[in-house]
């Protein structure tokens, strides 16, 4: 449902911004061989893992156990933040690669090579980026939460 192929078909079936339950039911289902289906399922599971790992890093997650900047020992806050920013970039790059791979496979399965591109833009990936300003806000929020007893 989150592939470029489903977005393409949904835009054809319902060119407005909203979709009815019947629109989703009208989506065509391609005959994908078992091996290809397993590959798509496995890489989709990895994409879900990456997104969950990212989500757990935020205070609004029910699995949140602390901010990464304070969980590892570094000789400076900058080095801790740099490690976090590098991890965010690795996750982002892996997710972009996975999403492009899934799109490429589905475009091929539906024979839409002439209509769609599997290129995934950075802005399309909803995952944390290493942002000094936002990460400072998160660190302060976490510190205040600790002082107020939120994490004890």
Per-region residue spans from a language model:
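Basic, amphipathic alpha-helical recognition segments used for DNA target recognition
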Residues: 1-26, 35-36, 42, 46-50
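Non-catalytic DNA-recognition/assembly elements of restriction-modification systems
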Residues: 28-152
């Amino acid at each position: 449902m989150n592939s470029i192929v489903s977005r393409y078909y949904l835009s054809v079936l319902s060119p407005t911004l909203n979709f009815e339950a019947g629109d989703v039911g009208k989506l065509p289902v391609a005959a994908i061989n078992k091996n290809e289906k397993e590959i798509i399922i496995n890489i989709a599971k990895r994409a879900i893992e990456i997104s969950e790992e990212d989500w757990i890093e935020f205070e609004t997650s029910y699995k949140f156990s602390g901010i990464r900047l304070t969980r590892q020992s570094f000789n400076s806050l900058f080095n801790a933040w740099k490690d976090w920013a590098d991890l965010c970039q690795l996750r982002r790059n892996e997710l972009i690669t996975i999403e492009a791979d899934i799109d490429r496979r589905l475009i091929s399965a539906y024979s839409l090579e002439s209509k769609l591109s599997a290129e995934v833009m950075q802005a399309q990936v909803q995952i944390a980026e290493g942002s000094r300003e936002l990460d400072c806000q998160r660190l302060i929020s976490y510190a205040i939460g600790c002082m107020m007893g939120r994490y004890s």
